């Protein structure tokens, strides 16, 4: 994976080496219940914690998409593309997401362009970009405070990719 990302994303054989599967688990029974496809290397998944909700959002690093993960009418888990993260041709490389405490927003940090994006997911079937800000090179982790008043972001992903002298924590 230590090759130019632009070349990697265009290389069908290289893309096959990255994960495109999500597995749902029954944590009480400690066993998987279903595996399904989410193209583009899904990384983090964030669940709505609102009472009665049964959905999550994931971001795919290599295709720069937001995906809604939800059961269909038959009880099967599905992933639906609900948003694009930046310009996929410029390889934003989303690496972390955080959901607001009220489940209304998803915060997405992208390593490739150093940008934090905020999506309104009050209707999770239609994620809408509502804000973005360039944080600096190598944006990595993002987290919201429990009261929803602050967002924290850090830099640094992998030491082999990191650029010297640009590690930070911003709030």
Where are these regions (language model features)?
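Predominantly soluble domains enriched in secretory-pathway, periplasmic, or organellar proteins
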Residues: 1-171
């Amino acid at each position: 994976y230590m090759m130019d990302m632009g070349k990697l994303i265009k290389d069908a054989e290289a893309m096959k080496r990255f994960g495109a599967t999500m597995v749902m688990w029954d944590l009480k029974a400690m066993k998987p219940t279903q595996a399904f496809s989410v193209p583009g290397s899904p990384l983090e998944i964030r669940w709505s914690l609102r009472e009665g909700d049964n959905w999550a959002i994931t971001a795919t690093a290599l295709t720069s998409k937001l995906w809604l993960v939800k059961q269909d009418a038959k009880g099967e888990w599905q992933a639906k593309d609900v948003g694009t993260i930046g310009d996929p041709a410029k390889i934003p490389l989303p690496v972390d997401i955080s959901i607001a405490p009220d489940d209304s927003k998803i915060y997405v940090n992208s390593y490739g362009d150093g940008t934090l994006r905020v999506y309104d997911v009050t209707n999770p079937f239609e994620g809408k970009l509502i804000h973005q800000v360039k944080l600096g090179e190598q944006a990595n982790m993002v987290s919201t405070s429990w009261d929803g008043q602050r967002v924290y972001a850090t830099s640094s992903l992998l030491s082999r990719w990191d650029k010297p002298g640009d590690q930070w924590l911003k709030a």
